[in-house]
Amino acid sequence: MERWTLSAILAFLLLLSLLLPSLLIMFIPSTFRQHASLWKARSLAKTLLMASSARLTPLSSSRTPCVLRQDSKKL
């Protein structure tokens, strides 16, 4: 097993110190994008929920869909 020399250790630490900030720069923007997409998904879900409840309210008071379902079951 070979021992590391002081110059090799310093070279490795220098390389690590140069690579670490670039890795952080690569991964930090992806976390911000995830929060934005999560916010958009929640907003879309809320919009779809409001739209579906507005459309379904008149249908539940109407008797026509119930009659159509019963006729299709007899066939």
UniProtKB/Swiss-Prot annotation:
Record InterPro entries: Micrvir_lysisE
Listed GO biological process terms: killing of cells of another organism
Superkingdom of this protein's organism: Viruses
Entry function: E protein is responsible for host cell lysis.
Protein name, per record: Lysis protein
Any Pfam family matching the protein: Microvir_lysis
Key words, A-Z: Cytolysis, Host cell lysis by virus, Viral release from host cell
Any one GO MF annotation of this record: enzyme inhibitor activity
Residue intervals passing through the bilayer: none
Species in which this protein is naturally found: Enterobacteria phage phiK
Additional free-text comment from the UniProt record: Phi KhT, a host-range mutant of phi K, can grow on E.coli C and B, besides K12, and is more thermosensitive than the parental phage phi K.
